[in-house]
Amino acid sequence: MKFFALFIYRPVATILIAVAITLCGVLGFRLLPVAPLPQVDFPVIMISASLPGASPETMASSVATPLERSLGRIAGVNEMTSSSSLGSTRIILEFNFNRDINGAARDVQAAINAAQSLLPSGMPSRPTYRKANPSDAPIMILTLTSDTYSQGELYDFASTQLAQTIAQIDGVGDVDVGGSSLPAVRVGLNPEALFNQGVSLDDVRSAISNANVRKPQGAIEDSSHRWQIQTNDELKTAAEYQPLIIHYNNGAAVRLSDVASVTDSVQDVRNAGMTNAKPAILLMIRKLPEANIIQTVNSIRARLPELQETIPAAIDLQIAQDRSPTIRASLEEVEQTLVISIALVILVVFLFLRSGRATLIPAVAVPVSLIGTFAAMYLCGFSLNNLSLMALTIATGFVVDDAIVVLENISRHLEAGMKPLQASLQGTREVGFTVLSMSVSLVAVFLPLLLMGGLPGRLLREFAVTLSVAIGISLVISLTLTPMMCGWMLKRSKPHSQPRNKGFGRVLVAMQEGYGKSLKWVLNHTRIVGLVLVGTIALNVWMYITIPKTFFPEQDTGVLMGGIQADQSISFQAMRVKLQDFMKIIREDPAVDNVTGFTGGSRVNSGMMFITLKARGERNETAQQVIDRLRGKLAKEPGANLFLMAVQDIRVGGRQSNASYQYTLLSDDLAALREWEPKIRKALAAMPELADVNSDQQDNGAEMNLTYDRETMSRLGIDVAAANSLLNNAFGQRQISTIYQPMNQYKVVMEVDPRYTQDISALDKMYVINNDGKSIPLSYFASWQPANAPLSVNHQGLSAASTISFNLPTGSSLSEASDAINRTMTQLGVPSTVRGSFAGTAQVFQDTMNSQVILILAAIATVYIVLGILYESYVHPLTILSTLPSAGVGALLALELFDAPFSLIALIGIMLLIGIVKKNAIMMVDFALDAQRNGNMSPQDAIFQACILRFRPIMMTTLAALFGALPLVISSGDGSELRQPLGITIVGGLAMSQLLTLYTTPVVYLFFDRLRVRFSRKNRTTVTE
């Protein structure tokens, strides 16, 4: 009593405490960063290595494997995957959450250094690493276009100037430049001219390499001067290489221009990039795992004017894609939803109390509690994101509950004629323990979430802590500021002016009277209610087992990502046409605002596209509906497939794939993997629960298999090294020399001119100079025939791997897709040598599924323990928890009605319902226990009186929570697909719980009371005997 009086009789101090809480919250709000979701990125490091011209199998065995063995010793690695393709290897290391990315990077560099001696000597550079996840969608894409500069020159500006500067911006993890390659001098050899002049390809390579040398020449000095020696030992342009003498034939000089075309071009001509219908260079910017996307994008945008000034005016630098506008729009929608929730909650209070002064009290308590939470969020290092703001939106209904319970009880005393200050003190004392029990038990629900590990734990931690802090502040405000305001603002009511005798008050009285009559009947037919309660428990179990489930709601971020997969034998020229055709189809869709794409590099049969949709208000379709519409049109394009997926804020794993979810096949027997993967993929593609089924196993590429006749080679004076060198010089885009410039280094690339390699007959024109200086045709000692060969070789750990990717068709859930995959694997009878497991997001979903039931049971157990401690009883907590089954049925039924799968967001709703619906029972049980102990009432009279007197606050608190969540259900703007499952779960659970628990709680209370009496009699009988 003295504690409450301290605040009631000292209004100035109480007001100033509330003002201090508010000011701290305002300051915290201004300092909080903005993000789409809490920081849940796994630390990922990508290692890249290249050996131009090397086959995928060579890259896998000679480059990937040594690196993997060394990298595999690093502590804290969750997963290591690699992909080796023509001339390049990429290894992805995903670390656990506890690894610091910088410390992991140092370990990676040490592992690369340790493996260096095992790598091929012909690698043009050491392996490099980047602290970014290549499977993440870029946070921003910049494009460079020009009518004046070539693609190679644009690429040079992009990689040399722009990418270097952008990479230094805080938060940027990787800047990937695509669409072309660095400028280079290309030497296109004429095999017939070489044969006529008696010049070998090695002669040309040696001559060029020796003619372009950058070596120190020293200095000359006398007694007073010093001269640095400088020579013209470097050749920098094609024009300087053309007159280069590479051989003498019968005393006549053979110049490079006599046997080759020498042009200023690019290192790799098999690259193409486009933005809309125009050739372009793309800068794809990805953030560091721990970086804030909004802050990073803002920093990049702030540097763009400066970057534009560093490049010529004839180059147009544009932002083709930016992830931040949709994130900001989504957060603005949540903030609007929060405001609407506050308004609806206050309206509910006004309808029940019918007093402006009384309504003002919770109208003050709610914003003070919510604003004060921002200070704690800042101290905890949180951000303003969809989940934390959703927590505050839901908290609106919670924080007003405490104030409502106190306010309603004080109002009841005022209506009975008590003086305001006395009513405040008496009313607060009566419900102080009730409010404490409600708040503490509600916070207890979130303790298992705080202890939950992995990505779900990280994801839900901000939500749980934010909501718990809001509830804690609300508890303080409701026991200090609320009674003080009631004592000084409210007046003693007169009988004729009581709100319950007017308007809505009469409706409430009628409802209360009707409830009283129905409750009397229920208390006389408890067995029926008991059967209903048992039925709801069984229905909960059945509905949870059968309801479709997924990991996270499918978001509409306004960005689509597409992967092109063409025939494995397609040429680059044909692939470029496919890219243009696909882009044309997509550009014609009315929902599309911008499209960029690129193809080429080490995988000539694949490409990537990034599509920006129009703002949500400018299109009628969701991102998934746009994909469904485009899927039919894209399927008509022969010889290639374009797989589209909506970019999500959460993507787990480092695998680059053409779909959202992955299933990985592993085997130590590569032949078995290559045999079974097509069978499994074909079977899965026929399943209606999956869409866009594709695989990264590409082992049907066209290969020309040369077989050397070693005896003939020995007789002709030719060794294998010379023959291999011939092939590399001719067809490997071999980098044979380096041109040093102040800003960058460029290569001299040699190959047979593409005009002479249009078909297999090009091999007939190849000659090797033997030990006697004679030109020997390749066909003299080698035979060849076409064969199939892999375009890529993939590993997971040290095992051969193949990842099957898939999307979900409209109406299908991830649980249904998972069941279909497991069923298919069983039906096919896949041997034990081929192991299958889900990967990435699908794997996290499996882990979450296994822990969901345990998490819910842990929350219930935690609440039981807390309530048992508060009530010093084993029985009363069970009475209070008997409200949960009806809420579960309501939540699951609502999800079914809205055709929404059970996701991690819906799980949050279930956890919240555990905390919300027990409040009704707490108010009933508290009053009934007090009536039994202090009012000498029978258990039945006590619980009946408790139900009647607590009817109004129960209705107020339930409707406040329900209306607080209602805006989440009806929201339709950006990010609504993330909010709706939470609102649907809470509204459905509250509605069903309110309907049933008003009757089941008193019945359960009486059941346990009779059970207690029966055991007490048995114990007394035993003692007497």
Curated annotation (Swiss-Prot):
Topology with respect to the bilayer: Multi-pass membrane protein
Location of the protein in the cell: Cell inner membrane
GO MF, any single term: xenobiotic transmembrane transporter activity
Cross-referenced Pfam families: ACR_tran
One cellular component term from this protein's GO annotations in UniProt: plasma membrane
Transmembrane domains' residue ranges: 3-23, 333-353, 360-380, 387-407, 431-451, 463-483, 528-548, 853-873, 875-895, 897-917, 953-973, 984-1004
Keywords for this protein: Cell inner membrane, Cell membrane, Membrane, Transmembrane, Transmembrane helix, Transport
InterPro entries: AcrB_DN_DC_subdom, Acrflvin-R, Multidrug-R_MdtC
PANTHER family: MULTIDRUG RESISTANCE PROTEIN MDTC, PTHR32063
HAMAP family, A to Z: MdtC (MF_01424)
NCBIfam families from the UniProt entry: PRK10614.1 (NF007905), RND_permease_2 (NF033617)
Family under the similarity heading: Belongs to the resistance-nodulation-cell division (RND) (TC 2.A.6) family. MdtC subfamily.
Subunit and partners: Part of a tripartite efflux system composed of MdtA, MdtB and MdtC. MdtC forms a heteromultimer with MdtB.
UniProt name for this protein: Multidrug resistance protein MdtC
Lineage: Bacteria, Pseudomonadati, Pseudomonadota, Gammaproteobacteria, Enterobacterales
